[in-house]
Amino acid sequence: MLEEAGEVLENVLKASCLPLGFIVFLPAVLLLVAPPLPAADAAHEFTVYRMQQYDLQGQPYGTRNAVLNTEARTVDADVLSRRCVLMRLLDFSYEHYQKALRQSAGAVVIILPRAMAAVPQDVVRQFMEIEPEMLAMETVVPVYFAVEDEALLSIYEQTQAASASQGSASAAEVLLHTATANGFQMVTSGAQSQAVSDWLITSVEGRLTGLGGEDLPTIVIVAHYDAFGVAPWLSLGADSNGSGISVLLELARLFSRLYTYKRTHAAYNLLFFASGGGKFNYQGTKRWLEDSLDHTDSSLLQDNVAFVLCLDTVGRGSHLRLHVSKPPREGTLQHVFLRELEMVAAHQFPDVSFSMVHKKINLADDVLAWEHERFAIRRLPAFTLSHLENHRAGPRSSIMDVRSRVDSKTLTRNTRIIAEALTRVIYNLTEKGTPPDMPVFTEQMQVQQEQIDSVMDWLTNQPRAAQLLDKDGTFLSTLEHFLSRYLKDVRQHHVKADKRDPEFVFYDQLKQVMNAYRVKPAIFDLLLALCIGAYLGMAYTAVQHFHVLYKTVQRLLLKAKAQ
């Protein structure tokens, strides 16, 4: 039999029997020469940033899961159940997000552009409005954000094409496409999220002591440094509240120079406080007040507090608003400061619209609106300066709050307004006859835009979510070092949640590596098995009836020779 098979093979090769040779040799040739998929096409690894997960006042917020291992689809697909739904920011909407959740999607991955500053403003505004809605509801679906690259964009486009074809084709076309199309299995490398125990929220305090007796009035300047957004690792907080911290640091620099010389050393204590946990109901400020007012006898807050000025989101726009819980009474230093702000804005910066916004404290709310309300609850006169009209404005809690949203000239202008008004209060310049249109900070003492820009660049060069800023990290050590250059008695204050009844709980696994593996659908294995079975059946039949095949080939060869 083997001799006959060899003779047939030799005859086939001599006669160039192409159809038969094609059938016999094609499978082997394909197996030998078919190249494997390139590594970049077979799998792609990229970094993903998980949506917020935290508990505040016992209420859970954000996504509760971190593990992902499911096949990718886009929102155009008819069936999203147990699928990883890919969405691009430019096509994202709250309706699409809700559709994925309603259909019990396995996960949601939102793909962000590489250059956030280039995103159209209507898309930015829309997403800023959606972010609070996404966080307001607890979800068990893992929600991730990824920054697009070429490979990830290619994965999205291929998945979108596959999803769209399934919705528009006939049943037979869908079956064929399902059997032959490529898919992507999305897998995260991390474990399930766990609560972080003993996490510390850190605040930094420093002071400039006034010249004179012990009972000098104290002006407190406060700004929280942490940022907030739907994803902690993407929360840069340029305007909210990088701008507030930038102004606080510049004020510390300016007044430290004034307090260096006896001739300009004022009879006011200046207390600077860079608070942590501002986006989590002002936890750093709350603990600082408790420690200063309830547990110590040597705090400046226990003495003659003139007023507390909180700085929050002052980096853009032509408006400045002083938010108060109770309008200042005439004759008080709070009212004097309000009047000075109005005069400086009107006479030196007429393009700025200044106003006061009165909002009572609602103790029934889980989260206070503004930071000054923490002080007002403890009966300390306080207000917040911001360009925002209300505390619910989108820029206060958005990953879209990037460096480009802060206008350097506007931030410098607002810093000058605040510095001029404070100086007029501290040195009583209006009562001494200084014209309102005469600037105080000029020449060597002027507000430095370069300094403010460098601080803003530093602040927005890293995410500043409260869950990410360790007390021994470089950010807090740099902030403390910066304040130590200009202030005295600089020190840290720490807040740790109570173990039995914690006010806040943070969770880990906020940044992971995700792998996208190119896979064939399960039905492809069935189709491949059928094809292999058919081929083996044909080969078996050919072997069993080899004598018939041999005679047929001989007959064909004789006819060829006869011709």
Swiss-Prot record:
Chain ranges on the Lumenal side, renumbered to this chain: 43-522
A GO term for molecular function: ribosome binding
Coiled coil regions, renumbered to chain: none
Principal place of residence: endoplasmic reticulum
Segments on the Cytoplasmic side according to the record's topology features: 544-563
Species assigned in the record: Rattus norvegicus (Rat)
Annotated transmembrane regions: 523-543
Assembly behavior: Component of the back of Sec61 (BOS) complex, composed of NCLN/Nicalin, NOMO1 and TMEM147. The BOS complex is part of the multi-pass translocon (MPT) complex, composed of three subcomplexes, the GEL complex (composed of RAB5IF/OPTI and TMCO1), the BOS complex (composed of NCLN/Nicalin, NOMO1 and TMEM147) and the PAT complex (composed of WDR83OS/Asterix and CCDC47). The MPT complex associates with the SEC61 complex.
Protein name as it appears in the record: BOS complex subunit NCLN
Family stated for the protein in its record: Belongs to the nicastrin family.
Gene, per the UniProt record: Ncln
InterPro entries on file: Nicalin, Peptidase_M28
Any one Gene Ontology cellular component term annotated for this protein: protein-containing complex
Compartments in which it is found: Endoplasmic reticulum membrane
Signal peptide: 1-42
Topology in membrane: Single-pass membrane protein
Keywords, ordered alphabetically: Endoplasmic reticulum, Glycoprotein, Membrane, Signal, Transmembrane, Transmembrane helix
Gene3D superfamilies membership: Zn peptidases
SUPFAM superfamilies on file: Zn-dependent exopeptidases
Superkingdom of origin organism: Eukaryota
Entry-linked CDD domains: M28_nicalin_like (cd03882)
